[in-house]
Amino acid sequence: MIQQESRLKVADNTGAKEILCIRVLGGSGRRYAGIGDVIVATVKDAIPGGNVKKGDVVKAVVVRTVKERRRPDGSYIRFDENAAVILKNDGEPRGTRIFGPVGRELREKKFMKIISLAPEVL
């Protein structure tokens, strides 16, 4: 569960290393974001020469959460860290590579490009 002020690792090669959630998109009173939800975030840590710089405001989709998520078959999925992938305005990933596994929930939310770039879908 990601909320305002949550810090997430960036799981792509845009140059950002860490982002801070400033808004969960999807309704005026929405408090939490899970796997597959889009957030507005600011870049807190970035490498020199990357596509994004520290202080940039970006949209990102959550791909891993520490809080477990219940699947329709009764199983649960959880990860060791909170991570997100930075998006362009049209919803496509801004980077060209994805690092680490991503949740299967992204497929239902129509993030097929991220699914195809990810090394593993759990």
Curated annotation (Swiss-Prot):
Alphabetical keyword list? Ribonucleoprotein, Ribosomal protein, RNA-binding, rRNA-binding
Single GO MF descriptor: large ribosomal subunit rRNA binding
The record, for SUPFAM superfamilies, names: Ribosomal protein L14
Q: Do the record's keywords include Signal?
A: no
Q: Which domain of life is it from?
A: Bacteria
* Cystine pairings recorded for this chain: none
**Gene3D superfamilies linked to this entry:** Ribosomal protein L14
Q: Which residues form a coiled coil?
A: none
Task: Give GO terms for biological process.
Answer: translation
* One Pfam family in the UniProt entry: Ribosomal_L14
GO CC, alphabetical? cytosolic large ribosomal subunit
Q: What CDD domains does this protein map onto? A: Ribosomal_uL14
**Signal peptide start and end residues:** none
**InterPro entries according to UniProt:** Ribosomal_uL14, Ribosomal_uL14_bac-type, Ribosomal_uL14_CS, Ribosomal_uL14_sf
Matches recorded under NCBIfam families: rplN_bact
Family indicated by similarity: Belongs to the universal ribosomal protein uL14 family.
State whether it acts alone or in a complex, and with which partners, per the record: Part of the 50S ribosomal subunit. Forms a cluster with proteins L3 and L19. In the 70S ribosome, L14 and L19 interact and together make contacts with the 16S rRNA in bridges B5 and B8.
Question: What's the stated role of this polypeptide?
Answer: Binds to 23S rRNA. Forms part of two intersubunit bridges in the 70S ribosome.
PANTHER family, per database record = 50S/60S RIBOSOMAL PROTEIN L14/L23, LARGE RIBOSOMAL SUBUNIT PROTEIN UL14M
Q: What name does UniProt use for this protein?
A: Large ribosomal subunit protein uL14
The record lists the lineage as:
Bacteria, Bacillati, Actinomycetota, Actinomycetes, Propionibacteriales
Q: Which gene encodes it?
A: rplN
